[in-house]
Amino acid sequence: MKFTKMHGLGNDYIYVDATSQKIENPNEISRFVSDRHFGIGSDGLVLILPSEIADFKMRMFNSDGSEAEMCGNAIRCVGKFVYDKKMTDKSTITIETLAGIKVLEMTVENDKVVLVKVDMGEPILKAETIPVLSEKHPVIDEEITAKDYCYNFTCVSMGNPHAITYIENVSEFPLEKIGPLFEFHEKFPRKTNVEFVELIDDSTIKMRVWERGAGETLACGTGACAVLVASVLKGYVGRKATVKLLGGDLTIEWNESDNHIYMTGPATTVFEGEIDI
């Protein structure tokens, strides 16, 4: 299998052109290639496929083999992948995902994509659609307890579920201990991504993420979008902010005129290769 390893702010995936090679059992392949000791090493696997309703289709799998609806960092890399490999000559393209069709605007320098702006669509705030078991709409400050830990979560879906809470010192937070308690909490019928957020000022947010099916990652694009939405709903920031993740910064904007979230950030190719599967 021919592959390209890429990352968006350190959120790394193995990218495969599935328009030119047949990939069977992607769940198993994702578990294999993601292993950082016995595989290539990644947060998961991304397949680029033909689409009947967009320029390309993206399927993505977490490191545990589960299929995810969408990943903001991964979709930026998909844009770079198809442009840099001359699969398209357009700098604005559409990508079909399980979370709907996304529009990508790519900044190109020296015939290579360096920055990608993604129209992430409208945030989903209905509890049953996120989904989260709550009577609130929108779900702001839902008190959830797991073992001895209790937090007020604001819940948002960007095509995948996110639960956001605010703390004082995100750098020192024991995420590996507490993240999974809420990822698998009964309040979330399809599990959830969990974001712990520290407010820096009214246009800067610092966050760490416990990703559903992957654990802590260096960055999560949909998570950054969900965090901005939650922070606007709670009156903490304006509609455009810098979101600081372990792997770097994303610019997130919640556009008032169309209600869409726009995410801008880098995409980087690490290396290419072939592996027996």
UniProtKB/Swiss-Prot annotation:
Keywords, sorted A to Z: Amino-acid biosynthesis, Cytoplasm, Isomerase, Lysine biosynthesis
GO biological process: lysine biosynthetic process via diaminopimelate
Residues annotated as catalytic: C71, C220
Biological function: Catalyzes the stereoinversion of LL-2,6-diaminopimelate (L,L-DAP) to meso-diaminopimelate (meso-DAP), a precursor of L-lysine.
SUPFAM superfamilies noted in UniProt: Diaminopimelate epimerase-like (SSF54506)
Catalytic reaction equation(s): (2S,6S)-2,6-diaminopimelate = meso-2,6-diaminopimelate
Enzyme class: isomerase
UniProt GO molecular function: diaminopimelate epimerase activity
This protein's name: Diaminopimelate epimerase
